[in-house]
Amino acid sequence: MISLNSSSIPSSQTKKVVIGMSGGVDSSVAAWMLKEQGFEVIGLFMKNWEDDDNDEYCSARQDWLDVVSVADMIGIDVEAVNFAAEYRERVFADFLCEYAAGRTPNPDVLCNAEIKFKAFLDHAMSLGADAIATGHYARVRHEGGRVQLLKAVDASKDQSYFLHRLTQQQLSKVMFPLGEIPKTEVRKIAEQIGLHNAKKKDSTGICFIGERPFREFLNRYLPRVPGPIKTPEGKTVGEHMGLAFFTLGQRKGIGLGGSQDGNGDAWYVARKDMANNTLYVAQGHEHPWLLANKLSAVDASWVSGAAPEPGSYSAKTRYRQTDSACTYIADIDTNNFSLSFPEAQWAVTPGQSAVLYDGDICLGGGIIST
């Protein structure tokens, strides 16, 4: 049996754990591990989207059935809770405002901070839980009354990027049973213990909304505002349907071929001029307009509760990106900061998160503004 590291458990008094269960293999194996470790485990399924809850894109109905089946198999109680109102108010409203302003938000970051580790945590505490757990790939280290957020052992699955806005208060009640285990091992465990969802594919859609044609989905909530598509030289090469429907670095769906000026390189979204409703595109993955050696970030959130000392760290400007060496400088008068990189970063995108690391320790981060 795989044992949890003692430093990953909030305290020696932790007995009752409420785990968020999605119906997927990760949270199912995490629940089994907790039960095997002797904790009193309750599974909690969150229903957070209702606008068009159908089986084509949102698998909530089948996911719930999978949760019930797994809970029955491993011998734990399970219940469902509806946080749709909280999700719409705390996450989705911000999501739409950011897109309307021309930025590209990351709803998973806000969903974790506001729903999975706030609304869910509050509900779990009302059930008498000592701690909560999820199937995230990350680690926590409880030492001396403080908590550190660390990368998962499986670097290819590490989700600390999405968790960087969690506070000491939230992390003090959190367990991540899968943080020390490779994803391949999780699949093996699921098969060995006979979980029916052992081969269920991982979800990749927007947090809780599911996998669906994104532009079509966004167009239901934001109006089309057509405008020109121009090159860095100012040549008009097409028309866009609205700046909200494009993101920096985007290659597909621009509506241009690769031969506007006799150059066969692919077109990429390089800039969005909101004031003039103009979409700028550039040819070639390494075009200068797609590269940046510095960024500014706002609304910083630090895991320790305090901004780190200025200096050399590493950072991610998007999920699954390899860490890049950087120099961090805090703005002492605001909750903002800047990062400079010796190696140019590709398609640094306003609205996304810039997350700072000291080795495996996730320090926190902020929202990229420029």
Swiss-Prot record:
Family annotation (HAMAP family): tRNA_thiouridyl_MnmA
Name this polypeptide is given: tRNA-specific 2-thiouridylase MnmA
Record-linked InterPro entries: MnmA-like (IPR004506), MnmA-like_C (IPR046885), MnmA-like_central (IPR046884), MnmA-like_central_sf (IPR023382), Rhodanese-like_dom (IPR001763), Rossmann-like_a/b/a_fold (IPR014729)
Site feature (Interaction with tRNA) residues: H136, Q352
Highest taxon above the source species: Bacteria
Main location as per UniProt: cytoplasm
UniProt record similarity statement: Belongs to the MnmA/TRMU family.
Any one of the GO CC terms: cytoplasm
Chain spans, region Interaction with target base in tRNA: 106-108
Function noted in UniProt: Catalyzes the 2-thiolation of uridine at the wobble position (U34) of tRNA, leading to the formation of s(2)U34.
Positions bound to ATP: G20, M21, S22, G23, G24, V25, D26, S27, M46, G135
The keyword Flavoprotein is annotated on this UniProt entry: no
EC number, UniProt record: 2.8.1.13
Native source organism of the sequence: Polynucleobacter asymbioticus (strain DSM 18221 / CIP 109841 / QLW-P1DMWA-1) (Polynucleobacter necessarius subsp. asymbioticus)
Location of region: Interaction with tRNA: 157-159, 318-319
Active-site annotation: C111 (nucleophile), C207 (cysteine persulfide intermediate)
UniProt-listed NCBIfam families: PRK00143.1, trmU
GO term, biological process aspect, one: tRNA wobble position uridine thiolation
Matching CDD domains: MnmA_TRMU-like
Name of encoding gene: mnmA
Localization of this protein: Cytoplasm
Molecular function GO terms recorded: ATP binding; tRNA binding; tRNA-uridine 2-sulfurtransferase activity
Keyword list, A-Z: ATP-binding, Cytoplasm, Disulfide bond, Nucleotide-binding, RNA-binding, Transferase, tRNA processing, tRNA-binding
Disulfide feature: C111-C207
Family annotation (SUPFAM superfamilies): Adenine nucleotide alpha hydrolases-like
Reaction(s) catalysed (UniProt annotation): S-sulfanyl-L-cysteinyl-[protein] + uridine(34) in tRNA + AH2 + ATP = 2-thiouridine(34) in tRNA + L-cysteinyl-[protein] + A + AMP + diphosphate + H(+)
